[in-house]
Amino acid sequence: MAEPGRPWAQARSAYRASEVLRRGTGRRRDPGPQSNGPGQEDARAPGRMARLRGQLRAEAASRSEVPRLLKLVERAGAGAAGRGREDRRAQPRAPCARYAGSPAAGPPTRRGSWRSASGGCRRAWRQCARSWAPGLRRCARSFERSWMPCARCCRRRRPRLPAASPAPSPAPRPAARPCRGRSAPLAPWSPPPGPQTTPRTAQQNAERTEPRPGRTTRRCQCRLGPRKVAGTEGGRTRAA
């Protein structure tokens, strides 16, 4: 739909140019001798880009945006046809447009393309920092020139503050209240009467681990390891 205040013909021309940029299809290459394919004469015929260029020139010959539209179409044709390796090497490389796997980052080194791309990024960053430094210095100088007079004026016109008074002395602590309980001092702690629980000695531990008289030290049969069974008598196993 055309924008308000814009002729429909201009919108149509711009739409066609944007379609060319979006699709990115250029002149078809020569398919070679084929039985059912197009022949040599069809391959030499003007391609789609040439026909579109002619239509744009014919439709927008009297409008002011003709050079811009033609430039868009030429750019689309160049991007669709693709540039050769020599053209890519000859064109100036954008310092901030390098990334891994891009032909603009240069040929990969023996250690891998990632190392080459990271080196290109570092060089691009240094170049950008060098280009930013003069502008930053100029901005700092202009800011200093505009700010320093204002600071001096404010320093001269600021009101005189009274001298700082000394810090107040802390309030005296209240006197300790007399004890309201019994006046006699508390007796020192003494252990309660009765047998005292002291830690067991090594001898007591040894006596505790010895078997008590009248009891067997034989462990439960279920806790014994596997034994060799020679036979079964009456449902009970007999050791060999």
Swiss-Prot record:
Disulfide bridge partners, by residue number: none
Family stated for the protein in its record: Belongs to the FAM246 family.
Pro residues bias (residue ranges): 165-175
Biological source species: Homo sapiens (Human)
Chain positions covered by the region annotation Disordered: 1-117, 161-240
Comp. bias (Basic and acidic residues): 19-31, 60-74
Domain of life: Eukaryota
Gene transcribed to yield this protein: FAM246C
Protein name: Protein FAM246C
Low complexity bias: start-end ranges: 176-187
